[in-house]
């Protein structure tokens, strides 16, 4: 699957999660601060539609038995858009009990 074969949608929360992940890699000295800055720009250049989450809050709370609020945000957005949820998180993929299609990355 290639990014140009599908429309990519993420909750706006994804932006902060990307930065948090890059911050961790810089603190572990796995990448330089300069490279992390380049990675942020690469991420921002991706053709991704970002969605606010305020209209998802009730559903996010409803998913609380199975997901953190962060994971539930992605599940709720996929449900709202009637779109597949693309994830590399096997645990998340196994936990989804809705009619949402799950596609896992290797």
List the model feature ranges, each with a label:
Residues 11, 63, 75-106:
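Acidic, PIN/NYN-like endoribonuclease modules and their adjacent C-terminal/linker elements
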């Amino acid at each position: 699957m290639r990014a140009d074969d599908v429309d990519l949608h993420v909750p706006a929360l994804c932006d902060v999660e990307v930065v948090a992940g890059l911050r961790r890699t810089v603190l572990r000295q796995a990448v330089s601060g300069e490279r992390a800055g380049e990675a942020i720009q690469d991420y921002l250049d991706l053709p991704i539609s970002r969605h606010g989450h305020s209209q998802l809050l009730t559903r996010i709370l409803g998913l609380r038995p199975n997901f953190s609020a962060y994971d539930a945000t992605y599940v709720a957005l996929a449900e709202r858009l009637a779109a597949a949820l693309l994830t590399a998180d096997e645990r998340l993929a196994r936990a989804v009990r809705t009619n949402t299609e799950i596609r896992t990355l290797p």
